[in-house]
A protein has these predicted regions:
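Extracytoplasmic/secreted envelope proteins and their assembly/folding machinery
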Residues: 2-3, 44, 48, 63-67, ...
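Soluble periplasmic/extracytoplasmic beta-strand elements of cell-envelope proteins
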Residues: 14-19, 42, 80, 206-208
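Short, conserved catalytic-motif segment at the N-terminal edge
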Residues: 10-33, 52
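Active-site SXXK
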Residues: 23, 32-56, 69, 207
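Mid-domain, small-residue-enriched loop/turn segments at the edges of structured enzyme/sensor domains
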Residues: 82-146
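Structured C-terminal helix/loop/strand segments within mature extracytoplasmic catalytic/sensor domains
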Residues: 1-3, 7-9, 25, 139-169, ...
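Conserved catalytic neighborhood of penicillin-recognizing serine enzymes
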Residues: 55-98, 108
Length: 236
């Protein structure tokens, strides 16, 4: 059913779903895409890793940057936290730290290479484009759900940030009312993504949808219907 839906849509689509109770996986058209703001979920994980290592203090400033980056998708908060991943507070050093973390944890399709805009600070990059995939996003969310991303207490903090998400018009809007969901969106004029942990009536699951359609807004109702289809299939 999902394959048929994706085939009928314009552009490139990836969908990754994992039932967190029985381990069943649906992984359709996995490919690297420009992640837009979904990269922020990985910046969050690396930041907590730096806190756990004692390289960064979990203070009010850092907490506020994490909250802004995740719950309202603030670009400047993300750019700052990338700097905070380095002792020198250099953006490119911070990005290198994040990429070392990603490769150590097996996020092979994800890389952080430049700042996000619009933002107060000016553009910084190492010449490559940011990349990720629906599958890498799904693996990250599963680890957060299981309490194995950085540590159980930091996984809980990450889950709480995602649960406070304000950008709810993609995966969450396809779900029955009252269903708890922790998500992070990403969008530009050409890509539309959402990554979510859904706490369903019968089972909890991860769902990540990446789309590159080239036309702004085209994907939103389609992500919503993918979300509803998956929910009904796993929770009927």
């Amino acid at each position: 059913k999902l394959s048929q839906m994706l085939n009928s849509y314009g552009g490139s689509w990836s969908v990754y779903v994992k039932d967190l109770k029985n381990g069943g996986v649906i992984n359709l058209n996995d490919q690297q895409m420009y992640p837009a703001s979904t990269i922020k979920a990985f910046v969050m994980a690396s930041t907590f890793d730096q806190i756990k290592r004692g390289n960064l203090s979990y203070n009010a400033t850092v907490k506020s940057l994490l909250t802004d980056m995740i719950t309202v998708s603030d670009n400047e908060a993300c750019n700052q936290l990338i700097r905070y991943n380095s002792k020198s507070r250099s953006f490119l050093d911070g990005a290198r730290t994040i990429n070392r973390y990603l490769s150590a944890k097996g996020y092979t399709e994800t890389g952080c290479h430049h700042s996000l805009h619009p933002a107060a600070s000016s553009y910084v990059g190492d010449g490559s484009s940011n990349v990720s995939s629906a599958k890498d996003c799904g693996v990250l969310l599963e680890r957060i759900y299981n309490g194995t991303c950085v540590s159980s207490s930091y996984s809980r903090a990450m889950l709480n940030l995602l649960l406070r998400q304000t950008r709810r018009w993609k995966i969450p809007s396809g779900l029955p009312s009252g269903v708890k969901v922790a998500n992070k969106t990403g969008e530009t004029s050409s890509v539309d993504h959402d990554m979510a942990i859904v706490f369903g009536k019968k089972t909890d699951y991860v769902i990540c949808v990446f789309s590159r359609t080239g036309s702004e807004g085209y994907a939103i109702p389609r992500i919503k219907s993918i979300s509803g289809t998956v929910y009904n299939y796993l929770n009927k």
